[in-house]
Amino acid sequence: MGGGKHGRGGKHGGSGKSRVWTIVLIVAAIVLVISLGVLGVIGYGYWHGTKVYDGISATSGLAKEETALADMTVNWDALREQNEDIVGWVYMPGTSIDYPIVQGENDEEYLQKDFTGSTSGLVHKGAIFLSADNAGDFSDSNSFIYGHNMNDETMFAHILAMTDQATFDAARTFYILTPTQNYRCRTYALDVVKNTETNILQPNFADEAAMRSYMTARINDSAVGAPTDVDLASVTKLFTLITCGDDYANTRAVLCGGCVEQAAPANAE
């Protein structure tokens, strides 16, 4: 009888373990399905965000094949119909940087809101925006333009990639296009700074000497070797592109560009 009881007890224990494993497998399956669903939603968010900006790029009518700076025109009226905060366009040949520039009431407005005004979804590419502390017509000596460092290598992700010397050297020119003036810029430094470092954010300078001192400081702190083809003495206007660093929350990658040519676009307002 004792043996019989033992036998029944062993069988009951096996059945209990079976139920436990069944529950574990069910929970694991549910977690897997949820995880795949979340990844799918995130993947769609990246894809959709890219499609949105591809459409905006088509609307801009930017003639990228033009070699003359004045012939690089943008359909500002069409873009204003989508967003009245439009102030310019940034384009860096050979990279994914090709976006409208907006200016919000503060520097938080377009961190999650894209050019169309949407903040929906799990992925927020936001918009490329001019600092609210800058003049909206880019009349400051140094204009600061921000964009997210996205995992799908869109928006301003390429800027962080330029901490690699070869990548930096491969794309040295970018354009800032506005309704009244077009600017061709050459990069002269790429600094990686703490997000608490504010002395880099100087929109204007007391005199030319102060501006040269600022540029020299950027070169001295550069994460890549400074090029020698930018005559600092001839540069009178700066454009600074900023994105998150590798750790996102604590550092910023700061791409410094000096204007080497400017011209009124053929459709200047």
Question: Where would I find each of the regions flagged by the language model?
Answer:
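N-terminal Lys/Arg-rich, disordered targeting/topogenic segments
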Residues: M1-V20
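Non-membrane alpha-helical secondary structure
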Residues: S15-W21, H48, D71
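Hydrophobic membrane-insertion alpha-helices, especially the h-region
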Residues: V24-G40
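Solvent-exposed, non-transmembrane regions of membrane-associated and secreted proteins
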Residues: S35-E269
